[in-house]
């Protein structure tokens, strides 16, 4: 347990450094959301309807932007080999690294959502709903993206391959995240059904992601 907590703290410190990746994802998310009102124009009703989709799409793209560094930096400096050979099960190490990535790169997006919701003409209830769906759904983006990052870690131009692998897995999360948010804003669909599916997707990814990523790393590093 001590080794896993040390790994989480280490990855968070690395991610929060300049060039570590977390800041890049947050700045990209802010840029996407801030520019969208200028692209949509003065129609505030349209902007509020598109608001949840804009926030979710920004979060998805920001997540993809930072996931390629999840294992790449460790592979480059040799620490990934040490993690693989340590007594700690590789599946738990992968889960710890994904959790650290979410805390450093995913959680700040959720914290920024209430402020950015004002730019998209969302009221407090709608903004809270979007933040809640991001809290429930962004772990799925991280843990499914971890599989693609593990597959691409030993490949040339692996970032492009990771995006191709991860995007299809992320589409259901995007669909149900936006659907749950839209249910609060426009109805008449119930918020509970898509939100429950979104939570289920995150739970499934929490279980499958570490095992699939560990298997990919073992195969790629052999």
Curated annotation (Swiss-Prot):
Keywords: Cell inner membrane, Cell membrane, Cytochrome c-type biogenesis, Membrane, Transmembrane, Transmembrane helix, Transport
Segments traversing the membrane: 20-40, 44-64, 102-122, 134-154, 160-180, 195-215
Bilayer disposition of the protein: Multi-pass membrane protein
GO biological process, one term: cytochrome c biosynthetic process
Function: Required for the export of heme to the periplasm for the biogenesis of c-type cytochromes.
Keyword Glycoprotein: no
InterPro entries in the cross-refs: Cyt_c_biogenesis_CcmB (IPR003544), Cyt_c_CcmB_bac (IPR026031)
Signal peptide limits: none
One annotated Gene Ontology cellular component of this protein: plasma membrane
PANTHER family: CYTOCHROME C BIOGENESIS B-RELATED (PTHR30070:SF1), HEME EXPORTER PROTEIN B (PTHR30070)
Name listed for the protein in its UniProt record: Heme exporter protein B
GO molecular function: heme transmembrane transporter activity
Family statement: Belongs to the CcmB/CycW/HelB family.
Main location, first listed in the record: membrane
SS bond partners: none
Localization, UniProt: Cell inner membrane
């Amino acid at each position: 347990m001590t080794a896993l907590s040390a790994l989480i703290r280490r990855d968070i410190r690395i991610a929060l450094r300049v060039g570590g990746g977390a800041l890049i994802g947050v700045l990209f998310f802010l840029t996407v959301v801030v520019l969208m009102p200028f692209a949509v124009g003065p129609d505030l009703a349209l902007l509020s309807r598109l608001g949840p989709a804009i926030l979710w799409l920004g979060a998805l793209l920001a997540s993809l932007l930072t996931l390629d560094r999840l294992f790449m930096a460790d592979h480059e400096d040799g620490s990934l080999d040490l993690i693989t050979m340590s007594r700690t099960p590789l599946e738990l190490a992968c889960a710890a690294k994904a959790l650290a990535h979410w805390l450093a790169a995913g959680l700040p997006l959720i914290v920024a959502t209430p402020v950015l919701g004002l730019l998209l003409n969302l009221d407090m209830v709608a903004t809270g709903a979007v933040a809640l769906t991001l809290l429930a759904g962004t772990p799925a983006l991280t843990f499914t993206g971890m599989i693609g990052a593990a597959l691409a870690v030993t490949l040339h131009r692996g970032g492009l391959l990771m995006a191709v692998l991860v995007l299809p897995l992320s589409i259901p999360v995007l669909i149900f995240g936006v659907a749950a948010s839209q249910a609060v804003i426009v109805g008449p669909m119930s918020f509970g059904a898509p939100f429950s599916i979104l939570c289920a997707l995150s739970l499934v990814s929490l279980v499958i992601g570490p095992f699939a990523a560990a298997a990919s790393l073992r195969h790629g590093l052999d």
